[in-house]
Amino acid sequence: MDKVKKLKISLTVGGESIVLSPPKMSALYLMAEMSPAQAAELFTGMKLSETDSLLVCEAVSQVVEDAVSRPELAVPYYPEKQEEIPFELFTGGEKLVAEYAGMSVPEVFELDIYDFRMLLRDAVIYNKMQTDKGRKWLKDAYRITQTVPDMDKLRKKFDIKKRVISEDGTEEKR
């Protein structure tokens, strides 16, 4: 799955140069429960000083932030009222990716963060495209991400003519 350029960070830790590849989802879940030293050892395979461990954890955080902030990997979102459910899903995204990609949930945990985000985005879009309500939801999700108004659509909606200045300096409305 090489559709997205993946950030790799080069570091010198413990006197050695290493390149951190994008972390797997399983490692990210484990990292949340570990000390910086344990997490750094998980990602590098080396026992490191406290400073180097923090450096590695910061680098991993940068890779995750890069993957999450990429516009091409953004999962569509549109707020909607839903019945309040007293439980929280912890692996809903992983289950969605597993069903979409024909993988098992454990296989999903072995994906790196970039591949996971790409598949999650595609799974959400694919699932929403299946119904009229979902297609409307996708259009609304797209609409709220736009930062520049579509002036032609606004003019049409409010029946406003476009002002055009000709070469001779006269103004006309079209």
Predicted ranges, named:
Residues 1-135, 174:
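An amphipathic, hydrophobic-aromatic interaction surface with interspersed Lys/Arg
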Residues 66, 70, 144-147, 160:
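A structural signal for alpha-helix termini and helix-coil/disorder junctions
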Residues 92, 148-150, 166-170:
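Intrinsically disordered, low-complexity regulatory regions of eukaryotic regulatory proteins
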Residues 126-156:
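Long, compositionally biased
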Residues 158-174:
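Short acidic DE-rich linear segments
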